[in-house]
Amino acid sequence: MKVKLFASFRDGRFIEKEWVYSEGLTVGRILEELAIDKKEVGVLLVNSRLTEPDYKLGEGDTLSIFPLIGGG
C-alpha cells in the first residue's frame, strides 16, 4: 500500500512512501506510527474517497493525509 503526505505533514517525513501492509491495519494506526495528531488532520482519503481513522486498509490502497488549513 502507499501513503502520501501533504503540506506541513511532509516536513521531516516523506512525500510518498510504500508501506508494509499487515492484516487489520487502520488509518489511525498509520497516523500513530507517523506521530501525527488526529486533531491536526484536515482530510483523510483512501483511494480518493473520504475516510475516518478507524477505516481498515487493504493491500492495494493509497492513503492521502492532509493537515488542517487555515487562512483568512
Residue spans of the language-model regions?
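Ubiquitin-like/PB1-type beta-grasp interaction modules and other compact soluble beta-rich domains
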Residues: 1-71
